[in-house]
Curated annotation (Swiss-Prot):
The keyword Transferase does not apply. Fluoride-specific ion channel. Important for reducing fluoride concentration in the cell, thus reducing its toxicity. It comes from Erythrobacter litoralis (strain HTCC2594). Keywords: Cell inner membrane, Cell membrane, Ion channel, Ion transport, Membrane, Metal-binding, Sodium, Transmembrane, Transmembrane helix, Transport. This is Fluoride-specific ion channel FluC. The chain crosses the membrane at residues 3-23, 46-66, 78-98, 109-129. It is a multi-pass membrane protein. The gene is fluC. It is found in: Cell inner membrane. PANTHER family: FLUORIDE EXPORT PROTEIN 1-RELATED. It catalyses: fluoride(in) = fluoride(out). One of its GO terms (cellular component) is plasma membrane. Na(+) is not transported, but it plays an essential structural role and its presence is essential for fluoride channel function. Belongs to the fluoride channel Fluc/FEX (TC 1.A.43) family.
Length: 136
């Protein structure tokens, strides 16, 4: 629970969420331009990359927040963690993409995507934490 006033906490989450959603949209557009629409229609590369990057950044954030005072932690956790990274990463899109692959008759791709997404997300989070412990 936050120590910030409820309105202030809500505004931090809302602002961060808007920023994160725009960043996710722009990264998806950039990846489509970089890899091409055919590659993006075969495998959800953008969602995989976004969720892995978001996990890395969450690990960095967690490592940094650990060193801050509780009041400062709350503001940055709500703005960046819940807001920006919550708006940036997307578990609902991941779930839909897995199911679409299953419906297309591609259960092996679906399984690969699940394994890659979970292992990359956890590995990226741990790497982010290790970076902050190494450099902070």
């Amino acid at each position: 629970m936050s120590t910030l006033p409820p309105l202030y906490a809500t505004l931090n989450v809302a602002l961060g969420g808007a920023i994160g959603a725009v960043l996710r949209y722009q990264m998806g557009r950039w990846m489509t331009g970089w890899l091409g629409a055919p590659a993006m229609s075969v495998f959800p590369w953008a969602t995989l990359a976004i969720n892995a990057l978001g996990s890395l950044l969450m690990g960095v954030l967690a490592g940094v927040l650990f060193k801050l005072s509780p009041g400062v932690q709350d503001q940055w956790r709500l703005l960046i963690g819940t807001g920006i990274l919550g708006g940036f990463t997307t578990f609902s899109a991941f779930s839909l993409e897995v199911w679409v692959m299953v419906e297309r008759g591609q259960p092996a791709f679906a399984a690969l995507y699940v394994v890659l997404s979970v292992s990359l997300a956890i590995s990226a989070l741990v790497f982010g934490l290790m970076l902050t412990r190494l450099f902070a």
